[in-house]
Amino acid sequence: MIHIAWLGKKSPFCGNVSYGNTITKKLKGRGYKVSFIHFDNPTNKDFSPSHFLGNNPEVSLPYLIKSQVYTIPSPRAERDLRESLALLKPDVVHASLTLSPLDFRLPEICKELNVPLVATFHPAFDSKLRNLTASTQQVTYQLYAPALANYGKVIVFSSSQKQLLQKLGIDENKLVIIPNGVDQNIWKPLASFSNKHNLIKKKIGQARVFLYMGRIVSEKNIETLLKAWKQVKKNKL
């Protein structure tokens, strides 16, 4: 059984939390052992021998500040991370970036422990540079590129991301594109109309309804989405 140490987020809720929960659930369902390491208020049991003997142990790292965007770890967090990985002895470490300044220390830690290191790098990305926020996103990529070059593999979601990271000096062979996907077992048309569905139709009418769930930011390409919806209406598809 392959043992994966997954460094990710449990809170506060954001896309990174959803990504980590979804992927680790699928991995466990396929028989992989997953140890989830994240920032939280650790308890004494986190480093007890019995805790690390579980099938899917969870380890908490101490922090000073935690937000949806970034976490500032406590001074002892790096030591706790190193010790937990040494005790867990995973076959591979996966980091769902960006998390914290420890992202930059992971390559050295994993090299010392002789364990492969993989990252999913998915900070917000807008290649069109239409505003200050998009420019700030570019700075994030520039800041992380030297560290990512020391990871074994880096998963990105698009060819645009891959091309940018290549320009920033990361070997093409280290970059792997795995596009975002949709779980068709969850997101699918209703098999039958429910009372709730009928109530909604009663309120808004029988016209076709498009629903967007997400942040109102440029990298979500909402303008393109709206144009596509208008085209659907125009062509009566």
Feature names for model-found ranges:
Residues 1-44, 113-115:
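N-terminal subdomain of nucleotide-sugar transferases
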Residues 5, 155, 204-230:
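Conserved donor-binding/catalytic core segment of Leloir-type glycosyltransferases
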Residues 116-118, 125-150, 192:
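Nucleotide-sugar donor phosphate/pyrophosphate-binding loop at the beta->alpha transition
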Residues 92-115, 119-126:
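An aromatic- and histidine-rich active-site surface loop
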Residues 40, 160, 181:
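Carbohydrate-associated surface elements
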Residues 188-204:
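A short helix/loop element that forms part of the nucleotide-sugar donor recognition site in Leloir-type
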Residues 150-158, 176:
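A short beta-strand/loop micro-motif in the catalytic core of glycosyltransferases
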Residues 48-82, 136:
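A short, charged, and often flexible helix/loop element on the N-terminal side
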